């Protein structure tokens, strides 16, 4: 017995050393100083095929969305829909609504201005021509900050990082055009479409064409209150306007201004004030409503396209639904942790979950923990229908043009979530091998940096690394 245990232990050590040696060969393809944590395991197996620093904590980046999606399906269900309503507790007499009109925003990340227009049209058709009261923008479904802890300040005005507020219209993103002045030294000017309720100021200096100063005089945007923005920096003279897009910073103010304009366009007047309602109130009579697509459809978009807005509104909604409190980042984090432990049997231990999208630099997770999540997904995919929502290598989403996987010959064989931040290239998902086995894998690659002169070709080492790694996984399992 002792001898057999010795042989088993020796065999395990040999297997591990071979694994480590093989992974070290892959790592030689990466830039100096890159950090890799990697785990590969057959679905349903008790031990990994490759275990390389699988307990090492790393930034998950957008692989975080896998956890968010699983917790959402368990807590909210695939048929859950975000709902936006127009409500009142008053009565309509001779075309006059005697009481306040409440626009209750339910954090629908897909709500559009046209949807608000349609709800206002329904209100008009119900016989309301005048409101004897206030118009309230109800955002009570969420509370606290709309920006998660650990989001970089310089991303805040970018549309991919638009605050996932209770009130979202057209993804809380707007576009402008910046025109250089005819004369160098004069201020460039901005044009904003009238249907965007924002105010833009230009402090952008026009430079002569080819000016050396342009290299270090960068455009920047400074957000202010009530969706006022100041654009600073320089713009070399150009014949065409420069298109730009920015994230709305105050979702409630933005949505309120849009609703106010749509009421005006519909010929509905009111005697009161446009106000924000943040405290939870009993609902009134619903006079118009709009529902989103089912959650499963939204999660598919979220995972395929790595949609941060959907991920973070869903994350906060999970906290709201789990604890019956306004959705906050902390409520979402605690809810996800509890759901995974109690209903999926996955204890995420010392994992740090700060948001649902993976944008936060506070997030930390080990490959071994993510592997538990993937194993649960694979073993319950008949009821979850999860793997089909992931990007498919060579075909769609963020894996459609993943060169390393294409060179590995695994197009159509890999379904996985990507995760990218500065110096981070992650993958978490599944590969169907040449023998027909389904393997789960977690690749957390960070500290990836190249020389400034190599920036144009910075992904070449990544392509070499991934092509060799996934070709071997595909062929040898």
From Swiss-Prot:
Catalytic activity: Preferential cleavage: (Ac)2-L-Lys-D-Ala-|-D-Ala. Also transpeptidation of peptidyl-alanyl moieties that are N-acyl substituents of D-alanine
Binding site for substrate: 417
Pathway: Cell wall biogenesis; peptidoglycan biosynthesis
NCBIfam families cross-referenced by the UniProt entry: PBP4 (TIGR00666), PRK11113.1 (NF008322)
Transmembrane segments: none
PANTHER family: D-ALANYL-D-ALANINE CARBOXYPEPTIDASE, PENICILLIN-SENSITIVE CARBOXYPEPTIDASE A
Gene label: dacB
Residues of the signal peptide: 1-20
Location of the active site: 62, 65, 306
Family statement drawn from the similarity comment of this UniProt entry: Belongs to the peptidase S13 family.
Chain's role: Not involved in transpeptidation but exclusively catalyzes a DD-carboxypeptidase and DD-endopeptidase reaction.
Top-tier EC class: hydrolase
Subcellular location: Periplasm
GO biological process: cell wall organization; FtsZ-dependent cytokinesis; peptidoglycan biosynthetic process; peptidoglycan metabolic process; proteolysis; regulation of cell shape; response to antibiotic
EC numbers for this chain: 3.4.16.4, 3.4.21.-
Xref: Gene3D superfamilies: D-Ala-D-Ala carboxypeptidase C, peptidase S13, DD-peptidase/beta-lactamase superfamily
Segments of this protein annotated with the region Absent in class-A beta-lactamases: 90-263
Further facts: In E.coli there are three murein endopeptidases: two are penicillin sensitive (DacB and PbpG), the other (MepA) not.
InterPro entries linked to this entry: Beta-lactam/transpept-like (IPR012338), Peptidase_S13 (IPR000667)
Record-given protein name: D-alanyl-D-alanine carboxypeptidase DacB
Highest taxon listed in the record's lineage: Bacteria
GO CC annotations on file: periplasmic space; plasma membrane
GO molecular function, one term: serine-type endopeptidase activity
Alphabetized UniProt keyword annotations: Antibiotic resistance, Cell cycle, Cell division, Cell shape, Cell wall biogenesis/degradation, Hydrolase, Peptidoglycan synthesis, Periplasm, Signal
């Amino acid at each position: 017995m002792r001898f057999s245990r010795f042989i088993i232990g020796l065999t395990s050590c040999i297997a591990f050393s071979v694994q480590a040696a093989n992974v070290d060969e892959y790592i030689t393809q990466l830039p100096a100083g890159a950090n890799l944590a990697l785990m590969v395991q057959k679905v349903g197996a008790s031990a990994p095929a490759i275990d390389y620093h699988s307990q090492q904590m790393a930034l998950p980046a957008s692989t975080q969305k896998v956890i968010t999606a699983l917790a959402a399906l368990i807590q909210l269900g695939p048929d859950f829909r975000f709902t936006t309503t127009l409500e009142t507790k008053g009565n309509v007499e001779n075309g006059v609504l005697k009481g306040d009109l409440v626009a209750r925003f339910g954090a629908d990340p897909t709500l559009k201005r046209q949807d608000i227009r349609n709800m206002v049209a329904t209100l008009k058709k119900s016989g309301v021509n005048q409101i004897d009261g206030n118009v309230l923008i109800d955002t009570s479904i969420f509370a606290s900050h709309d920006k998660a802890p650990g989001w970089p300040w310089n991303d805040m005005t970018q549309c991919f990082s638009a605050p996932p507020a209770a009130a979202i219209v057209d993804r809380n993103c707007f576009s402008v055009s910046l025109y250089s002045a005819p004369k160098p030294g004069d201020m460039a000017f901005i044009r904003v479409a009238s249907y965007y309720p924002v105010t833009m100021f230009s402090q952008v200096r026009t430079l002569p064409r080819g000016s050396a100063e342009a290299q270090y005089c960068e455009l920047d945007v400074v957000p202010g209150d009530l969706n006022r923005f100041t654009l600073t920096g320089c713009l070399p003279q150009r014949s065409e306007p420069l298109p730009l897009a920015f994230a709305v910073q105050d979702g409630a103010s933005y949505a309120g201004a849009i609703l106010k304009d749509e009421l005006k366009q519909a010929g509905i007047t009111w005697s009161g004030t446009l106000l924000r309602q943040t405290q939870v109130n009993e609902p009134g009579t619903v006079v118009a409503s709009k529902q989103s697509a089912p959650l499963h459809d939204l999660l598919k978009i979220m995972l395929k396209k790595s949609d941060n807005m959907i991920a973070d509104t869903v994350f906060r909604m999970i906290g709201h639904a789990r604890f019956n409190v306004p959705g906050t980042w902390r409520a979402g984090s605690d809810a996800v942790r509890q759901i995974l432990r109690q209903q999926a049997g996955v204890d995420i231990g010392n994992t740090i979950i700060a948001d649902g999208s993976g944008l936060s630099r506070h997030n930390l997770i080990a490959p071994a923990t993510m592997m538990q999540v993937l194993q649960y997904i694979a073993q319950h995919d008949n009821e979850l229908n999860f793997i089909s929502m992931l990007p498919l290598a060579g075909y769609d989403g963020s894996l459609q043009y993943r060169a390393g996987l294409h060179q590995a010959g695994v197009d159509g064989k890999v379904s996985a979530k990507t995760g990218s931040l500065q110096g981070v290239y992650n993958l978490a998902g599944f590969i169907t091998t040449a023998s027909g086995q389904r393997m789960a894998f977690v690749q957390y690659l960070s500290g990836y940096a190249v020389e400034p002169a190599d920036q144009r070709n910075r992904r070449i080492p990544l392509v070499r690394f991934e092509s060799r790694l996934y070709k071997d996984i595909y062929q040898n399992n």
